[in-house]
Amino acid sequence: MVNRAHLARSAALLALAAAAISCRSINAPAGVDREMAASIPADTLILGGVKLDELRASPLYPKLPPAARALAEPLRDARYLLLASNGKDIVAIARGRFREAPPGATLVAPGLAVTGSPGSVRAAIAQYKTGRNGAPDLLARAASLADGRQIWMVARGGVPLPVTGNAANLNRLLRDTEYAGIAVRLGSGIEIEATAVGRTAEAGREFEENLRAILSLTAAASARQPDVVALIRSIQIRREDRTVRASLSGGAAAADRLLRLVPR
């Protein structure tokens, strides 16, 4: 006969193991742990992530704009960076090998630092104290998009992005979306994947048409820059019901051309 006490102990151990796995489990991009997720303010509308360790190891890292590398320098001991915005303020949440808080940052927990405006830092710390994921839907959206990519961003639909100039066309494009996201992989070449989900199938169709129109106009306006035109024409666009995906990939030469387009 099986010892009942032994069965009870086994059941208790299984329950504890399941609870431990549940506590560690989080629907988020690889590298984002529960403490990082709990530091995302609850009013976050736009969320981005950077796998700093992998980005620094990329052959293309030295070719990034100086401003981008200067942003990462104070976080040289960080391995992962989250950037959360409510449309007004941005807070950076960094996980790394911090013995003390990086310059201008606040250490929330061992190896976890936040920096930003005073209000955004207070919001991140207050959310951390609740122990709850501040943006579970955005992290879940990012989970598959960010797979194998060093840089990613997701945004709730209809949220104005903090962009100006020609980039402001993005806000008109995203007005009727439920959510949108983009991810970048830098290796010997570059891969970019963008996704947008319309509020309805009709909104998805209009998004695709508007995106194609914007790209056509941009190509026409760049006629004297054949490299740029070639890049634009290489973008692949496909739609499935409400979801529109656009992708671009190329080798080192394409990556160089794209990086030259980034403001210095």
Regions found by a protein language model. Give the residues of each.
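Classical N-terminal targeting signals for secretion and organelle import
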Residues: 1, 19-23
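Bacterial N-terminal signal peptides that target proteins for export
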Residues: 1-12
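Bacterial N-terminal signal peptides
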Residues: 11-20
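Soluble, non-membrane globular domain cores that form compact, hydrophobic packing
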Residues: 23-264
